[in-house]
Amino acid sequence: MTIALGKFTKDEKDLFDIMDDWLRRDRFVFVGWSGLLLFPCAYFALGGWFTGTTFVTSWYTHGLASSYLEGCNFLTAAVSTPANSLAHSLLLLWGPEAQGDFTRWCQLGGLWAFVALHGAFALIGFMLRQFELARSVQLRPYNAIAFSGPIAVFVSVFLIYPLGQSGWFFAPSFGVAAIFRFILFFQGFHNWTLNPFHMMGVAGVLGAALLCAIHGATVENTLFEDGDGANTFRAFNPTQAEETYSMVTANRFWSQIFGVAFSNKRWLHFFMLFVPVTGLWMSALGVVGLALNLRAYDFVSQEIRAAEDPEFETFYTKNILLNEGIRAWMAAQDQPHENLIFPEEVLPRGNAL
C-alpha cells in the first residue's frame, strides 16, 4: 500500500478564503485582517475628536468652553471627560444617561468615552497590523513589540488611572492645554516628578532621543563615497547592494571618544529599541501605581526639619509647598460640585512668610 504525502488542497474556496484573498491582497494601502479593527476604530476616534473640538461644550461637565464654536483655538479646544457624578459609566448613546439623545450625550461627555475606547482599539489594531505585515513578508515582529510602549502609556493614562480613581472625570481630556493641566494635576496630587517610574520614563525617552541623534549623525559621518554628487543625497544610489556606511570606522571613532563603542549592529539597534520601549513601559507601570494612589519618594526628615527651622529649606521642601498650592487651587476649580472652600490660613506659604 502506498501513502502519498502532500499538501491538501480544497476544490473550491470558502468565504474565509475569499475574504483572506481580498484583505491581504497586494495594494497601495494594505488592509489585512487587522484593518477590520484599525480603520473603523481610527475613523470613529478621529471623527469624534474633530466633532467634539469643533462643536461640543464642556460647560455641563467642567464649566468650561472647549470648542472652536465657543472661541477656543487648536491649543485650548478639547474633548472633555464626563462629569464626576457619572463615575465609570460607559456613557453609551442608548444608555440610561443619554437615552438616545445625541445632544444630551455630547453634553454629558459621551464623546470622551467614545474617543477613548475607539482610540485604544485603534492603537491595538495598528500593532496587530504590524504583526500581520511582518508575518506576511517574513520579518521579526519587533516593530509591533516596540509599539506596545505607546499603547501601554495610552491605556494606563486614559483608562486604568481613572478606573482607579472615582470616575472618568479624573482622566485627561483630549486637548493640548487639557493635557498640560492633567500633568499639573499629576504633580500636585501625586508628586509625579519624584516618582521613580517617571524618572525611568524620562531617562528612556530622552535617552532614546540622544541615541537617535548620535546614530543618525554617525551613519551620515561614515557614509561611503558612492558617486561624484555634490552631497549625500545626490551621490546615494538607492538600488546599490552593498552597505552604505562603515561600521568599523564608526566603532573606531566612538571608541576614541568614550572608550567604549558598540561592536555590532544587532546590539546597537536592539539597545535603541530597548531604551525607549522600556522607558514607556516603566511610565505606564508608574501610572498604574498612581491609579492605586501609591506614593512617590517622601523625604520626611527634611519636611520635619523645615517645619521646625525657618532657615532650613531644600528644593524638595519648596516643591512640596508648591504641590500643596496646586492641590488647594485645583481642587476647588476642578471640582466645583464639591463646594470646596479653603480659608486663607490653610493655603500654603513659604517659610519666609
Swiss-Prot record:
Protein's GO biological process: photosynthetic electron transport in photosystem II
Catalysed reactions listed for this entry: 2 a plastoquinone + 4 hnu + 2 H2O = 2 a plastoquinol + O2
CDD domains linked: Photosystem-II_D2
One Pfam family matching this protein: Photo_RC
Subcellular location: Plastid, Chloroplast thylakoid membrane
GO cellular component: chloroplast; chloroplast thylakoid; chloroplast thylakoid membrane; photosystem II; plastid; thylakoid
Residue pairs linked by disulfide bridges in the UniProt entry: none
Post-translational changes noted in the entry: Phosphorylation occurs in normal plant growth light conditions. Rapid dephosphorylation occurs during heat shock.
GO MF annotation list: chlorophyll binding; electron transporter, transferring electrons within the cyclic electron transport pathway of photosynthesis activity; iron ion binding; mRNA binding; oxygen evolving activity
Residue intervals passing through the bilayer: 41-61, 125-141, 153-166, 208-228, 279-295
Listed SUPFAM superfamilies: Bacterial photosystem II reaction centre, L and M subunits (SSF81483)
Binding site for a plastoquinone: 215, 262
Binding site for chlorophyll a PD2: 198
EC number: 1.10.3.9
InterPro entries the record matches: D1/D2, Photo_II_D1/D2_sf, Photo_RC_L/M, Photo_RC_L/M_CS, PSII_PsbD/D2
Cofactor note text: The D1/D2 heterodimer binds P680, chlorophylls that are the primary electron donor of PSII, and subsequent electron acceptors. It shares a non-heme iron and each subunit binds pheophytin, quinone, additional chlorophylls, carotenoids and lipids. There is also a Cl(-1) ion associated with D1 and D2, which is required for oxygen evolution. The PSII complex binds additional chlorophylls, carotenoids and specific lipids.
Keywords: Acetylation, Chlorophyll, Chloroplast, Chromophore, Electron transport, Iron, Magnesium, Membrane, Metal-binding, Oxidoreductase, Phosphoprotein, Photosynthesis, Photosystem II, Plastid, Thylakoid, Transmembrane, Transmembrane helix, Transport
Main localization of the protein described in the UniProt heading: plastid
Residue sites binding pheophytin a per the record: 130, 143
Modified residues (Phosphothreonine): 2
Membrane topology: Multi-pass membrane protein
Family stated for the protein in its record: Belongs to the reaction center PufL/M/PsbA/D family.
Miscellaneous field: 2 of the reaction center chlorophylls (ChlD1 and ChlD2) are entirely coordinated by water.
Subunit comment: PSII is composed of 1 copy each of membrane proteins PsbA, PsbB, PsbC, PsbD, PsbE, PsbF, PsbH, PsbI, PsbJ, PsbK, PsbL, PsbM, PsbT, PsbX, PsbY, PsbZ, Psb30/Ycf12, at least 3 peripheral proteins of the oxygen-evolving complex and a large number of cofactors. It forms dimeric complexes. Interacts with PAM68.
Function: Photosystem II (PSII) is a light-driven water:plastoquinone oxidoreductase that uses light energy to abstract electrons from H(2)O, generating O(2) and a proton gradient subsequently used for ATP formation. It consists of a core antenna complex that captures photons, and an electron transfer chain that converts photonic excitation into a charge separation. The D1/D2 (PsbA/PsbD) reaction center heterodimer binds P680, the primary electron donor of PSII as well as several subsequent electron acceptors. D2 is needed for assembly of a stable PSII complex.
Name of the protein in question: Photosystem II D2 protein
Biological source species: Arabidopsis thaliana
The gene coding this protein: psbD
